[in-house]
């Protein structure tokens, strides 16, 4: 999803993600945050396989430790070190608005840089309205909450789950229980009542649909 959004932003600028030389980097909270790090690792694998023409100009990544002010400072440091960078991926809801604010401070917009990542619609709408980015994503928090409540009630009712089980959640669909290792390399999973259930869908926001969401 992150790479797809980056590609869409590049194409909006007339850059061919498959054939043009593209420079990019990652800016998020820190390498020890399981979900964010797993997204970065998965994204790198996609880039390596499908976009060998992309160059990561900061393989050690940029980290702002979920600090809003630091996210702006680090964001400005990224742009100072790589003023012609094509893509900045912010797989963290604090890093993304900070990077966007840094871009505005330095005179960038969606026509000369592609910044994308994960954050709530309300946190980013202003930057999108300003023309600083083309798209960003997350998930529908209502669906997330409904899944969490249903699974909690399902197990509280005495049901036992294990990796490989498929749970049918009304109004959402069939969801498979995955091993913890699916999001955290080397993580153990207990035999029962343990594992990961992923949201069946994620959401991509643009100027066209961002006002359909209020969270």
Regions found by a protein language model. Name each.
Residues 1-215:
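A residue-level marker of the well-folded mature domains of exported/periplasmic proteins
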């Amino acid at each position: 999803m992150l790479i797809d959004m980056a590609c869409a932003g590049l194409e909006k600028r007339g850059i061919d993600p498959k054939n043009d030389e593209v420079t990019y980097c990652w800016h998020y909270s820190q390498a020890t945050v399981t979900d964010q790090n797993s997204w970065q690792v998965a994204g790198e694998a996609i880039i390596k396989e499908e976009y060998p023409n992309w160059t990561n100009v900061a393989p050690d990544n940029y980290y702002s430790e979920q600090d809003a002010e630091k996210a702006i400072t680090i964001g400005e440091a990224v742009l100072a070190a790589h003023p012609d960078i094509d893509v900045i991926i912010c797989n963290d809801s604090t890093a993304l608005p900070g990077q966007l604010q840094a871009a505005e401070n330095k005179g960038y917009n969606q026509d000369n840089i592609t910044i994308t990542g994960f954050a709530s619609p309300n946190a980013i709408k202003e930057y999108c309205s300003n023309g600083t980015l083309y798209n960003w994503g997350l998930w529908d928090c209502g669906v997330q909450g409904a899944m969490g409540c249903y699974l909690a009630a399902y197990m509280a009712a005495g049901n036992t789950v294990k990796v490989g089980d498929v749970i049918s959640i009304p109004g959402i669909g069939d969801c498979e229980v995955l091993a913890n290792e699916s999001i955290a390399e080397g993580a153990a999973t207990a035999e029962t009542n343990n594992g990961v259930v992923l949201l069946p869908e994620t959401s991509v926001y643009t100027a066209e649909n961002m006002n359909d969401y209020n969270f």
